[in-house]
Amino acid sequence: MTEIEEIKRQVVKQALELEPGGFRPTNSLTESWIGRVYLYKENERIPLDKNGEQMIPLLQLCIDNLPLIPKALSKTKVITVFIASELPFEITPNGKEWILREYTESDELVIKDLKNPSSLLKAFPLKPKIIKEDYPVFDGGGLANELEERILELEESGVIDDYGELLDNVYGHKLGGYPSFCQP
C-alpha cells in the first residue's frame, strides 16, 4: 500500500448525499424535503420566532428509510428544521432564531399542509445517494495535524501536485461524511 493509499484509508468516510429535485414527490411519511416540512405531531404547528412571526420551514429529514444511517441517529425517525426570516449574527441556542425538532419511533406524526407564505424558499424533495468515499477539505477540519503536515511534504516533494487531487470532498446536502462549508 502506498503512502497516499494509507492516508486515504485513514480518513475516508461514507456519507449520504441528498440530491434535490429531479423526480416526482410522493408526499409520504418517509420523504425528505428541503424548503418544506409537512410532518408534525398533532398539536404542533410552524413555530414562531422572537417577533411572533412564523419561521421558515427549511428541512424535513426522514431517517428511517435512508440507505445509510449514522449511529448517532439510529433511534431518530424524523428531523425537522425551521429558521427565522431574520437570521442571527451570532450562534443562538435551539429555539431562539431556529428550531430543530427530533422525532423517534414512538412519536406519532401526521401530515399537515402548513406553509409560511412569506418564505422565499422553493421546496424540493430530496433523493438519497450513497457516497462511498468522502474526505475532509484540507483546511476545514477532519485531518490530524500530522496528516496535514505529511500531505504538505508530499506536495513540496512533487509526489502530488495538490491535496485536491489526493482526497475529494463531496459538496452539497449530505448526512455523515465531512463538512463542506466551514467557517471558523
Q: Each predicted region: which residue ranges?
A:
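Preference for intrinsically disordered or flexible, low-complexity segments
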Residues: 1-184
